């Protein structure tokens, strides 16, 4: 600290010399002691400069020393403040020195990595350099996020996919893992996300769509449990948000896996569908479109949630020429997933099916509860727009637009 004080004093003397040289006066060098106090410096230094000429009023040296003393006096007043600044700088430097230093190599690696990431273009999910969605992400939805209406998602155009959906689905099943077993409806939804005729969407929007698809499946299972409880005259129980999140993440991980596989094989699945059909020995005629039409008439909720891998008979409604609905049977495969039963029900954050706002328009129309052997559903107080809410049981009606 004392060394810095001397340095500042020397700088002030040099500055005073330059000012004196500019004004035509020469600064004389005096050997004096260092004065620590501001007042002492302001009083003592001018007196020392004028000590030799007090009794000589007409001496030329008196005028010279008077000018010099004023300069020294101004500089002396600045010395204590400059000393405080130097001391503050030393304390800051000492504090910085005590902080742990980051390895220079790590800093360079992080800087180079950030620079490379900045130079890379932001690719959409439909670009050739496909970047899938990570399967490590979890979706912890709150109670308020569950107790909301499902937003309608973009519905694929049936006339565009009917001719080739069966061949695309068969090829997609071949490239998927054995435990996935995607349905035609799921294949059509993924095709819709990667369709180049639409405006390309980012991976973030695709992830939001997959979340909505998974949420639809969970709410479908929730309504099914409510319906089974009503038929058996059991007390309606609430499902915790944690249980809903558990099933939601199972469905979401399944959708993400199918999404990543479809994106990697997009060029061979949907860019040249006719070539895929010929390579598999199939056709792209009206028979494929008929198969898709039959599948789309089956509600999404017809899939079972049991662990058994057997087949079940599901019912679908068909409109005849006389206006009366006709019941027919279609064989469908079951999905393998964690059992979503009442045994995993708790009382924290209850979610009741009566709060679910469902409509017969859009994807949510296929969420009506299903039970094999009966084509009526229990609506209770649910807002289901399928013919009114006055009656306790309303027959299920398929939507006018095919649902994927």
UniProtKB/Swiss-Prot annotation:
Domain comment (free text): The RxLR-dEER motif acts to carry the protein into the host cell cytoplasm through binding to cell surface phosphatidylinositol-3-phosphate.
Protein name: Secreted RxLR effector protein 12
Record motif RxLR-dEER, residues: 48-65
Signal peptide interval: 1-21
Location of this chain's protein in the cell: Secreted; Host cell
Gene: RXLR12
Family according to the record: Belongs to the RxLR effector family.
Function statement: Secreted effector that completely suppresses the host cell death induced by cell death-inducing proteins.
Keyword Secreted: yes
Predominant subcellular localization, coarse grouping: secreted
Keyword terms of this UniProt record: Secreted, Signal, Virulence
GO cellular-component term (any): host cell
